[in-house]
Amino acid sequence: MNTELLIIGGGASGICAGIQAARMGIKTLIIEESSMVGGMFNAAGVTAFDGNKYAVGGGIFGEFRKKIEDHYGGPDNTFTGWISLTCFEPRVGQKALDELIASAGDNLTIWYNTKLVSIIKEANTIKGAIVEPQNSGDSEVSKFRSSEVPVYADITVEATEYGDVLYLAGLPFRFGRESTFESGEPSAPHDPDEIIQDLTYCAILKKDPDNIKIVPPSENYDPERFVNSTAEHSNSSDEVYLNHKLHNWESFISYATLPGDKYLLNWPFRSNDYPTTAEIYDDFEKRKWHLEKAKELTRDYIHYMQTKLGHPEWGIDESAYDTPDNFPPIPYVRESRRGIGNYYMREWDVVPDEYTLR
């Protein structure tokens, strides 16, 4: 199999790169491990944009946002949660993304449910990748006889959620924060660290008091794990000690309210953020185990909402995703491996100052 452009990962960056490249006449193949593209803003369930007003107003993101706003009748109708000006249901996001994919025409091919196995290299040059279908019934890759398919490309793009291309290609990368002495960034720490941001298995909830379904807790469930996630169940009012504000129920449930009496569960305070370790990145089998534990944590928090916080009317939205458990097909991975190249983005590249047009 040969293509001009191979994009490994159909997340937010990968799908946008693929659409634009195909529009420019480049034969493009996207390899996506899950059943859904869109990454953070759809497949991972974060259907409330990080960044407001002008932050996602241009390019493919701007087109995507405009389609969502048009669906709901304007931007005022997507400002349903105080976390974002653009909140939307996953099905609406999928429809908007499908339209953008269609606009790319025949130059764009997407192989879903297809796993990255290894990177093809010649000397110091990446020539493509070997991939493997995980569900041949759902993937165009099934037309090939071999279970592992080599894909050769003029250009290969790293767009995975974890930076797996960097790892498998043996390229240099880093985790954590650089020191201010290395980066020159005033906001960077004095000493570097390898602290990796938490990941979150988000969930879309729906308010339905006539159809209450209590989510069963795990065997590890302990409601005290979530103490101080809101003011409704707390043992301290010292927000300096807690290092965050204590929100009441109304503030909590309006945080990421979606249209249609729905809610994005991605609460940042002592709820369903899952501590991330390097082995999630380095060991693919342990990654699966950790992701199940992250999903378990989210289920436990939903149970906690329904029981300890006294709101059984909020349950998992069974219409949000075509997955067996109605969860998003992938987690929200905040931090990928970061390649160490000739240049990397720094604070001064994005912060406005008097010498730039930003």
Predicted segment positions?
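Beta1/beta-strand and adjacent pyrophosphate-binding region of the FAD-binding site
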Residues: 1-13
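Membrane-embedded transmembrane-helix bundle of lipid-linked glycan/lipid transferases
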Residues: 6-8, 17, 22, 120-125, ...
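Flavin (FAD/FMN)-binding glycine-rich loop and adjacent Rossmann-like elements that form
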Residues: 113, 135, 144-155, 159-358
